[in-house]
From Swiss-Prot:
The keyword Transferase applies. It comes from Shouchella clausii (strain KSM-K16) (Alkalihalobacillus clausii). HAMAP family: Asp_carb_tr (MF_00001). The lineage of its organism: Bacteria, Bacillati, Bacillota, Bacilli, Bacillales. InterPro entries: Asp/Orn_carbamoyltranf_P-bd (IPR006132), Asp/Orn_carbamoylTrfase (IPR006130), Asp/Orn_carbamoylTrfase_sf (IPR036901), Asp_carbamoyltransf (IPR002082), Asp_carbamoyltransf_Asp/Orn-bd (IPR006131). Its EC number is 2.1.3.2. This is Aspartate carbamoyltransferase catalytic subunit. It comes from the Bacteria. Pfam families: OTCace (PF00185), OTCace_N (PF02729). One of its GO terms (biological process) is 'de novo' UMP biosynthetic process. One of its GO terms (cellular component) is cytosol. Disulfide bonds: none annotated. Keywords: Pyrimidine biosynthesis, Transferase. L-aspartate binds at residues 87, 169, 220.
Amino acid sequence: MLSAQIEKATQKGLCTMNEMGVSEVLDLLKTAESFAAGAVWKPRMQLFVANLFFEPSTRTRFSFEVAERRLGLEVLQFDGQHASTQKGESLYDTARTLESIGASALVIRHRQDAYFHELKGLSVPIINAGDGCGNHPTQSLLDLLTIKQEFSSFSGLHVVIAGDLAHSRVARSNADILTRLGARVSVAGPIEWMGEFTDTYTHVSMDEAARQADVLMMLRVQHERHDDNALFSKEAYHQAYGLTEQREALMAKQSIIMHPAPVNRDVEIASVLVECKRSRIYKQSANGVAVRMAVLKRALA
């Protein structure tokens, strides 16, 4: 009986984009679109969802909380600075405790790559809100929804992911699923920050990226994950690898700019472009609520 509950929880949770087929992804996007259009779903009974954030977060944390409250869920907020993990309690024991006191799902962001492998014995769904440099599936889904709203289809689109790819869970979640959905993915940025991506994807210059991309997906320089923060000055990075006003002028009329945020203005993107006509950065944030409502419904229905 317990093994069946664990298997069901695994199926309803969401830890990586790779665990979902294309049809599942499209179904989730369809559900998200319905929520964005005003659809209502409520659980039949009182359900508690615990949000465990072990890393700083604004967009993801509050987006999940808004999604949970719109669905009529009871939200348990976890403060990692004042929790028993500070006394040495393991992530598993913390999660197991929340499961035992009645949490129906756990939303977790953790600095450790693939932390969720340690939680396979739980019988409640785990929703990954970001693991180290590994995965960020709900960010990927909201990015996909934003692209779908713009172009209706993914087939034939050229998406360039640019910036600090080696340290980006967003890049890892997006590159493969975009390819599976029919898009062509290229990468841009310092070759030192490409990690494994140049093994699979074509590396282009930033000027080429601006000219060629239907979707130019800029990534934050993750200074906190670099051993050497002084590899580039902010000004040098912006001129060599950022989206400057001059590069934006090279972009095709229909092309859009995306960024998972937070944005380092005048580093990845010129400040004047953050809210320009082709920017979809705040649309991405707005779409996060509908996407996370869809993911929570899938986990709890």
